[in-house]
């Protein structure tokens, strides 16, 4: 019999007086027995609960379970979605290509077609934080420093944080950074410049500013065929015009195949009943076919 059950059952019955005396006598003479119920030791004063994080780092990991468990896969998916958005936007004059070695590095080039920087071809690299999209905004660095108020004259880095002071996930995207990099060449902003000389010349001596811009555009064009600074199979490389290669590619881009009109009409056809004869505007002009009996 279970001792716990026998003890609880015995406690519910009233014992005879003689038995109580005998039992009390035994308790006096026999040594004390340990209680059948186990008790936990007392909790120390400085103890920390198990459910409470021991450090802020652990707290950040617990609040972001997706990064903690699926970090690399989540990052890869986010960057793939970002590149898909870039392709869908079809930014005019902007081309990018993710690196072969790291998805956190994208190679790009901007073609400026009019304005002060007309005929400019500026190659750049986008550096994406490894905790994207929860970190800072991506960095955009030109291969050669462009003479511009918002471009650092030494490093060639564009002041991206001016437009994205705080990067907000699901709201800010990399295509917006690329669009901003294109827009700065058409709309000049001189407030808090990274290149004070360019800002002062734009405000006080526009002719000298234009002269330096022309020199900067020519400098970038003279180095257009240089090998990339970063060795990567997917780096953007320019080569001189080769008719044997480029003529055929140009013809394919310029030649547009037009679909026949009847095929276009078929694509625009809506399935369903129609009571109008093709080629007529009179309603109920279509002959109704009778089903054979």
Swiss-Prot record:
UniProt keyword annotations, A-Z: Apoptosis, Cell membrane, Cytoplasm, Membrane, Protein transport, Transport
MF GO annotations: ubiquitin conjugating enzyme activity
Cellular compartments annotated: Cytoplasm; Cell membrane
Membrane topology: Peripheral membrane protein
Cysteine pairs bridged by disulfides in the record: none
GO term, biological process aspect, one: protein K63-linked ubiquitination
Bias kind Basic and acidic residues: ranges: 14-23
Segments of this protein annotated with the region Disordered: 1-64, 269-293
UniProt keyword Acyltransferase present: no
Similarity comment text for this entry: Belongs to the ubiquitin-conjugating enzyme family. FTS subfamily.
Role according to the record: May function to promote vesicle trafficking and/or fusion. May also regulate apoptosis.
Protein name as catalogued: AKT-interacting protein
Upper taxonomic lineage: Eukaryota, Metazoa, Chordata, Craniata, Vertebrata
